[in-house]
């Protein structure tokens, strides 16, 4: 089998990492490359494992995303939607298994399918009550809110032949650069508009116009949608007890799309300018300095190799 090539690409998450800390960006996309097969004690392997770890809040969000993906993928194939109780039980078992494995730091023994928590890796003090509160409010609470929401009712009413995608990693090209995207759920309504839904498990309520616009640009290429035929939907799942998930619809007008193109163009240029060989996508660690924001370092999975513990 041919060796994998570390080709240059862009995504909103890659852009955010580059903005937050260029050293963390290097570690994630260059320093860790090949770590899936590197010797256990090598620096490359360490960076590879660490980049796979997440904070407990990120982990809880991924558990929720995976649960909803499982629910809708199965419904798309079989026509049946699991009841809430069954999804809760499946999710509980999976979360417990992942938590137990992370606590034992078994992620160091895995080749590539790595799930682990930075709190366990760095021995951060988190009480049992805090872990329980996280599960009940973010994981279980999000699933309850989703099942009570008008969003799920709209999905139920939409014929499956108008379901366009369920959290599928895909890509498109912008001025020659591959752009990665994963829309949580996409469907076409009766009027032909394409709705792109994004599940949110954080507390922030601000609209990420770049993310919405990049989804819209992708949809226009993927499904040949008219400029005014895309509607972004941010679905906030973490709510007060008993409240349904809330959807905020965001229109992607031409001004927003052009602002996104400008940002992407500039971001890609900055990333490529930092490379020692742009054609071969080769980077040197010394060209990617560490952030001076020590508070950000305290939350970063790379704090040990960076000497910022």
Describe the predicted segments one by one:
Residues 4-7, 28-51, 191-197, 274-283:
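Short amphipathic alpha-helical segments and their helix-coil junctions
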Residues 8, 178, 208-212, 293, ...:
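Active-site-proximal structural scaffolding
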Residues 9, 51-58, 202, 206, ...:
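Short, solvent-exposed segments of well-ordered alpha helices
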Residues 15-31, 40-76, 96, 132-136, ...:
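Nuclease catalytic cores
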Residues 15-39, 173-186, 264-269:
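An acidic intrinsically disordered interaction segment
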Residues 36-39, 160-220:
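Non-catalytic protein-protein interaction segments used by genome-maintenance enzymes to assemble
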Residues 63, 67-164:
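A non-catalytic, helix-rich entry segment at domain boundaries
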Residues 221-309:
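Metal-dependent nuclease catalytic regions and adjoining charged, substrate-binding loops involved
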């Amino acid at each position: 089998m041919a060796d994998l090539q570390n080709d240059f690409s862009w995504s909103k998450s890659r852009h955010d990492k580059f903005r937050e800390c260029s050293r963390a960006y290097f570690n994630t996309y260059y320093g860790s490359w090949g770590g899936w097969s590197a010797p256990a004690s090598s620096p490359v392997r360490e960076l590879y494992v660490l980049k796979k770890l997440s904070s407990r809040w990120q982990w809880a969000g991924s558990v929720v995303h995976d649960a909803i993906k499982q629910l809708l993928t199965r419904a798309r194939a079989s026509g049946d939607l699991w009841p809430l109780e069954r999804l809760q039980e499946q999710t509980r078992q999976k979360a417990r298994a992942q938590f137990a494995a992370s606590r034992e730091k078994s992620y160091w023994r895995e080749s590539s399918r790595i799930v682990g928590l930075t709190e366990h890796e760095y021995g951060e003090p988190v009480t049992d009550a805090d872990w329980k509160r996280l599960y009940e409010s973010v994981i279980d609470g999000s699933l309850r809110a989703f099942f009570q929401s008008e969003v799920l009712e709209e999905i139920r009413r939409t014929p499956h032949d108008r379901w366009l995608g369920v959290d599928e990693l895909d890509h498109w090209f912008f001025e020659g650069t591959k752009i990665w995207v994963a829309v949580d759920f996409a469907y076409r309504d009766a009027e032909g508009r394409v709705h792109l839904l994004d599940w949110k498990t954080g507390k922030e309520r601000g609209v990420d116009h770049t993310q919405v616009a990049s989804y819209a640009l992708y949809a226009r290429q993927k499904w040949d949608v008219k400029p005014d035929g895309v509607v972004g939907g941010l679905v906030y799942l973490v709510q007060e007890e008993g409240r349904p998930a809330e959807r905020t619809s965001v229109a992607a007008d031409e001004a927003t799309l052009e602002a996104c193109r400008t940002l992407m163009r500039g971001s890609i240029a900055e990333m490529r300018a930092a490379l020692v060989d742009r054609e071969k996508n080769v980077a040197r660690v010394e060209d990617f300095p560490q952030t001076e924001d020590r508070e950000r370092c305290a939350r970063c999975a790379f704090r040990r190799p960076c000497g910022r513990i």
